Amino acid sequence: MEELLSKVKQNLILNHNEDDVLLSGFITAAISYAESYQKKPDGYYKENPMHPTTEQAVIMLSSHFYESRDGSTGGFFADKVEASQQVWHVVNMLLRLNRDVVI
């Protein structure tokens, strides 16, 4: 989790530790979303390596959660609300690359 936290902070250009607990919660939520979307069991990425495309999706989604933490479309998304939808589109596309097929 520490490595992912560092990567999310780099993505957000954060140089302080004040929001580490908050970010860790967002990372946990993003990983849970990835596991669910990819049809993997809960906790899968605690025991198995994360593919780089899945990791990028988790970084993007965690960053999106942080930037949108007040529930509005403020900050980065204030001028273009559809930019938020684009984040979800890209995240889902990246996660699809490592999705388990359930028959």
Where are these regions (language model features)?
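Divalent metal-cofactor coordination and adjacent catalytic microenvironments
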Residues: 1-103
